């Protein structure tokens, strides 16, 4: 618990859960990072002073042994994830107090350094940076936007998320792997009683090295995770701004787009409700992929590296997000095949593909090797899964009021206990504004070529929204179109 909540003093109620070799075993199993701790116990009034008490891990390694009523110290060379309290069978232990002998984490120094660096950066862009005042003000706005979208993190704890514990487990697994000499980390050696767990072979973890490295310099798990999320929010604001600005050639459009996207409902649900860290990280780079495709087809063909880097970062964030992005890229390229074949633009696409593939081989090769050499549950997945039953009800796309703590339920339950699947007010207004804009331009006889790419993005958005609902024939495609099963 100290490992999770950065406390320096904790008191536990003890409850007998079993017996072993003349010793009574008590809960809870305590998680402590490396360090020195003072230990004290409380016993029932009938307990004497000559009963032995131990603290040991599951492997039987004893860290403390003393008589009832004594206080003592334990020293841990590494993080112990489950320490167990045992006493002589005749003694009745009721409480244990664990207090750190000195500071456990370096959080306050780290946070002070972040504040100092943040203020230094703000002063630099305001008074010493290149460009006009509007650029400095835009940077200030984007930073403020990222910090505002992080407000659920401004507590001393973490909000519960569906997948939160798994991602915290991944971060500490990487930290343990680095500490044991692995790089890149492929196996969480301390998991499964020391047998190890190969999560890193199947989950991309590039960005999780940031909080893992913070863990290695003494930052608590909570602060390390929050640091990653705040950085993700600020990065989302900046990338969304420059992506929208790059396509629209408008700073104002970039700011509006950044605000709508950064404060989007589904992005917030991924971060704070579902704890879907991979999907949340992948959403940083969706706008960058759109900008990259734009430059390949219509913009500066020499900026092919934008698409390449966007694909690399997407791949290193979320495999499913990568697959969806790849499908959309292919669709856009096919729609604009004539533009792609002009002026040597296709060579930019080839360079982007080769560059992205080369930078991802360090992950792709172990992934393919592990997938085809291991007996995995996913290979026995039910091909008759009812996708349509889990699709959204159209009303949900525009629903403003819902419980963020819900889950994705079947259609038979209607909106009961449903997680928010709404676009949000901002995105809905933007969608309506785009529709009015294109209709008005059509009536005024404006050339479609002036905003061809934007119109294509708008139409694709409508199609994807429709495909996310139960109105789309997912079941029919599953039963009659083989590729849809994949």
Where does each model-flagged region fall?
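Periplasmic/ER-lumenal interhelical loops and adjacent helix-loop junctions
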Residues: 348, 353-440, 453
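Membrane-helix boundary/interfacial segments in multi-pass membrane proteins
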Residues: 160-165, 170, 175, 193-195, ...
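Membrane-interface transmembrane helices that cradle and orient dolichyl/undecaprenyl
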Residues: 289-305, 314
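Transmembrane-embedded, aromatic-rich helix segments that form part
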Residues: 305-308, 321-336, 367
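Start-transfer (signal-anchor) and selected internal transmembrane alpha helices
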Residues: 104-152
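Glycan-recognition and processing domains
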Residues: 1-36, 47, 56-57, 97-99, ...
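Membrane-interface helix-loop-helix junctions at transmembrane boundaries of multi-pass membrane enzymes
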Residues: 130-133, 252, 339-349, 432-474
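Active-site lumenal/periplasmic loops and adjacent helix-entry segments of GT-C-fold
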Residues: 146-285, 292, 313-314, 319-320
């Amino acid at each position: 618990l100290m490992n999770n909540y950065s406390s320096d003093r904790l008191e536990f109620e003890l409850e007998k859960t079993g017996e072993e070799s003349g010793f009574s075993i008590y809960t809870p199993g305590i998680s402590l990072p490396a360090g020195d701790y003072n230990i004290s116990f409380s016993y029932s009034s009938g307990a004497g002073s000559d009963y032995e008490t131990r603290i040991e891990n599951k492997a039987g390694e004893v860290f403390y042994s003393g008589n009832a009523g004594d206080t003592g110290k334990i020293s841990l060379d590494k993080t112990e994830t489950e320490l167990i309290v045992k006493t002589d069978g005749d003694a009745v232990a009721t409480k244990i107090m664990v207090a750190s002998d000195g500071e456990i984490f370096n959080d306050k120094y780290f946070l002070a350094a972040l504040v100092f660096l943040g203020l230094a950066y703000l002063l630099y862009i305001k008074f010493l940076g290149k460009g006009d005042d509007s650029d400095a003000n835009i940077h200030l706005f984007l930073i403020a936007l990222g910090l505002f979208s992080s407000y659920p993190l401004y507590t001393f704890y973490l909000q519960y998320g569906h997948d939160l514990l798994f991602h915290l487990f991944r971060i500490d697994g990487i930290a343990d792997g680095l500490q044991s000499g692995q790089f890149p980390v492929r196996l969480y050696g301390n998991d499964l009683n020391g047998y190890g767990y190969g999560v890193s072979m199947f989950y991309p973890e590039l960005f999780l090295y940031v909080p893992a490295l913070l863990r290695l310099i003494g930052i608590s798990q909570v602060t390390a995770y929050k640091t990653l999320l705040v950085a993700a929010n600020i990065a989302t604001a900046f990338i969304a701004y420059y992506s929208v600005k790059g396509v629209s050639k408008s700073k104002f459009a970039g700011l509006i787009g950044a605000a709508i996207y950064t404060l989007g409902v589904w992005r917030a649900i991924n971060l704070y409700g579902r704890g879907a860290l991979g999907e949340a990280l992948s959403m940083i780079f969706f706008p960058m992929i759109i900008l990259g495709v734009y430059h390949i087809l219509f913009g500066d063909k020499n900026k092919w590296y934008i698409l390449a880097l966007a694909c690399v970062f997407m791949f290193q964030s979320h495999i499913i997000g990568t697959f969806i992005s790849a499908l959309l890229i292919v669709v856009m390229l096919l729609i604009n095949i004539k533009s792609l074949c002009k002026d040597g633009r296709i060579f930019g696409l080839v360079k982007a593909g080769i560059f992205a593939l080369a930078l991802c081989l360090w992950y792709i090769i172990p992934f393919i090797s592990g997938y085809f050499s291991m007996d995995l549950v996913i290979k026995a997945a039910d091909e008759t899964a009812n996708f349509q039953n889990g699709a959204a009800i159209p009303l949900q796309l525009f629903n403003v009021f819902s419980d963020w703590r819900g889950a994705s339920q079947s259609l038979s339950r209607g909106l009961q206990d449903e997680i928010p699947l709404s676009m949000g007010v901002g995105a809905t207004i933007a969608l309506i504004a785009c529709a009015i804009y294109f209709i008005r331009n059509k009536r005024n006889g404006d050339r479609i070529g002036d905003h061809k790419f934007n119109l294509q993005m708008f139409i694709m958005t409508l199609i994807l929204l429709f495909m996310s609902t139960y109105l789309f024939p997912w079941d029919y495609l599953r039963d009659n179109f083989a590729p849809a099963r994949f």
